[in-house]
C-alpha cells in the first residue's frame, strides 16, 4: 500500500487527541503524568508491544519503554527509538482557561502542541503501519519520559541506556518555524540561586540599619544575570521565591536557565554563573549547577538520516528544510551521544512562528498537519533500515 493511502482521518485524529490533551500532566505531579503513561501503555500493548514500566525517581512519574517488532528481521539489535515525553508545563486546572477547542484550522488546548500531539502522531503512524501490514525494517521502541520539562533529572540515565545501541532516534517535538525539522539544539543549563543575608530582614518603619532584604539583593542580581546574555548564550530567570510575610524575608531563591549554542558558550555560561558566588558562605548569592541538557551539534549520521526524511517527504510531495533550535529536547541527549537523531517531527503550530508560545495560553496546532506529519512519520519508519 502507498503511504499516501493510509487512512489518517483528520476528524478521527482530532477526536482521539482530545483524550490525551484532557489528561493534564504537569511535570511535578506524578499521579497526573502517570495517567498519560497509562494511556500510552494501553495503546502500545494493544499493538503488541512488549512493555517495560519503571518507577520514576525524585517524585516524578513513571518511565515507559515499549518495543514493537514487526520488522523484516534484517536487524534485530539496533533499531529506532522514538523519544517522547508525557509531561507539560501547564498546572492542573489549565484546561479551564485553555480548553481543547477547534477554531478553523487551529486546535487549542493546554499541551496540545507540546507535547501531546507529537506522541499521539507517532502512535498513530505505527498503528497505521501495523494495521496495513506494512513491515518496517527495524524494531521500533517508544521511550516516554515523565520529566522532560524539568530537564530529565529522573529519566536521564534511562534515556542514555535506551538510545545507546539504537541506530536512529526520532523526536516528535513541534516542527521548526518553516514546517521543517530540527538538526541540532543548544545546550540547556540550569542553575539554582540562593540569596541569604547576615540578619533576617524584618521591615520596620524605623529601620535605618542599611541591611538590604534578600529580595532586594536577588532583584539586583536578576538584572545583572539577564544582561549577561549574548548572541550565543542567553540567560533567563524563570522563578523567584521568597518571603514568609509581607514584612519578613529570610532568604530568596531563584532558578536560571541558560541556552548556549556552542561548546565555548557552554563553558562561558557556566563560568559566568559560578563567578557570581559570594565568598561568604553565610550571606550573599550562592549558585549551584542543576540539571543540564548537552549541546547537540549535527553530524554526518544525522544528515544521512535527514536525507532519508527528505526522500520520505518526496513520496508525500512535501519539502522539508532543516535548522537548529533552542528549547531543549530528548534529542539533545541522543544527539550528543552520537546517535543519528532527527527532531522537530511533530505538528506545526503557533510556536513554530513564535518561540515559547507553545508554553503559553496562545498555544495551538494546525489541524492539517496532523495527517501530514502522521504520514511523514509512517513513511520514514517504513524506509529506515
Q: Can you say where each PLM-predicted feature lies in the sequence?
A:
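Acidic/histidine-rich catalytic neighborhood of metal-dependent amide-processing enzymes
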Residues: 115-188, 385
